[in-house]
Amino acid sequence: MEVVEVLHMNGGNGDSSYANNSLVQQKVILMTKPITEQAMIDLYSSLFPETLCIADLGCSLGANTFLVVSQLVKIVEKERKKHGFKSPEFYFHFNDLPGNDFNTLFQSLGAFQEDLRKHIGESFGPCFFSGVPGSFYTRLFPSKSLHFVYSSYSLMWLSQVPNGIENNKGNIYMARTSPLSVIKAYYKQYEIDFSNFLKYRSEELMKGGKMVLTLLGRESEDPTSKECCYIWELLAMALNKLVEEGLIKEEKVDAFNIPQYTPSPAEVKYIVEKEGSFTINRLETSRVHWNASNNEKNGGYNVSRCMRAVAEPLLVSHFDKELMDLVFHKYEEIISDCMSKEKTEFINVIVSLTKIN
């Protein structure tokens, strides 16, 4: 499985689309706004650029993408008015892997711009937008061309499934029953990927440029702790139930692994300091409930829909597409039972960085 070819959120605007099932991600963007705001204020008030070049890496599609744009424009507009400056030109780069539904994203752009003008007037901008398909573990932009990089709920995804994890049988991710060699392989791949990410962004950002990165993570130093692995363990349970029913072959489940690593703040700090291109301004964690909806009665349904929007393309690349409704029905039942018995939360790691040279 080539991750770059199959990793993307469900496109379009249907029942299983990411656009209609990304409330958790929206809440996280709103929760991290104070950190984003401070980073952008510090950047703008130190450089006062006439053109502000911003990249959203792992932008996906839907309202959340435009929520980020709206936040950043409003922050800059408020700050430039304090100094009596003319509004800068804004140049937003939307980056994601080639399978992302860029068509749906850009079809929504006109309505978003009109709505933004209604809220903050005509005096800002102009705004320019471009789509940049490709892996953010490679170079994406010209040298020293960016002022600000933003990424939310993307950097936990790996560039590939780690090598040497063939013995992770019965699991689809790191789990309490995973051999130590599997845990080490996942961390090794994460360290390689995140180091490359920092290296390439340091080449693309100008001196003093900022990054605000939010990713799924954990507070525990145990990479198999429930706070980061449990959601995937429950999906593995759903798949294994279909194995028991003879609908999926056991070896198919054994051969499937999620290309993701959810780091601790200490791991993020270690890799940033080891790579050496950035200083850490803030490094924090936050929590958000699996069920971001206020509708508690349908918690299992809401969470399974959210996870389907995220994971279905990966699953379809390996399993029969016709089984997806059944897989996520089983998953919903398992999640509902789990949520009735215990507290279920995602842990977010947020880091604000400044490029040194």
Swiss-Prot record:
It catalyses: benzoate + S-adenosyl-L-methionine = methyl benzoate + S-adenosyl-L-homocysteine; salicylate + S-adenosyl-L-methionine = methyl salicylate + S-adenosyl-L-homocysteine. One of its GO terms (biological process) is methylation. Mg(2+) binds at residues 168, 254, 256-257. The record marks 150 as: Involved in substrate discrimination. Keywords: Magnesium, Metal-binding, Methyltransferase, S-adenosyl-L-methionine, Transferase. Induction: Triggered by EOBI in flowers. Fades out in flower petals after pollination, thus resulting in a decrease in methylbenzoate emission. Strongly repressed by ethylene. Gene3D superfamilies: Methyltransferase, alpha-helical capping domain (1.10.1200.270), Vaccinia Virus protein VP39 (3.40.50.150). This is S-adenosyl-L-methionine:benzoic acid/salicylic acid carboxyl methyltransferase 2. It comes from Petunia hybrida (Petunia). The gene is BSMT2.
